[in-house]
């Protein structure tokens, strides 16, 4: 899978789950499980419920996402 295959969407973190996993509600109303990307983990970027985030979805599994950006 190349980087061109990902779908980027905006969403809001609804709740924290164990192991740096979050429930994210997307703009279109769908709720997905999201995990923090490696760079965000490396730079200790904290994510709290209510934060606006950008997630990447793969076309193969639309129920899971990678959180790549937290809006200020």
UniProtKB/Swiss-Prot annotation:
Pfam families associated with the record: eIF-1a
Gene3D superfamilies xrefs: Nucleic acid-binding proteins (2.40.50.140)
Functional note: One of the essential components for the initiation of protein synthesis. Stabilizes the binding of IF-2 and IF-3 on the 30S subunit to which N-formylmethionyl-tRNA(fMet) subsequently binds. Helps modulate mRNA selection, yielding the 30S pre-initiation complex (PIC). Upon addition of the 50S ribosomal subunit IF-1, IF-2 and IF-3 are released leaving the mature 70S translation initiation complex.
Protein name (record): Translation initiation factor IF-1 1
Binding partners and assembly: Component of the 30S ribosomal translation pre-initiation complex which assembles on the 30S ribosome in the order IF-2 and IF-3, IF-1 and N-formylmethionyl-tRNA(fMet); mRNA recruitment can occur at any time during PIC assembly.
A single GO cellular-component term on record: cytosol
Gene Ontology MF annotations: ribosome binding; rRNA binding; translation initiation factor activity
Domain S1-like, first and last residues per copy: 1-72
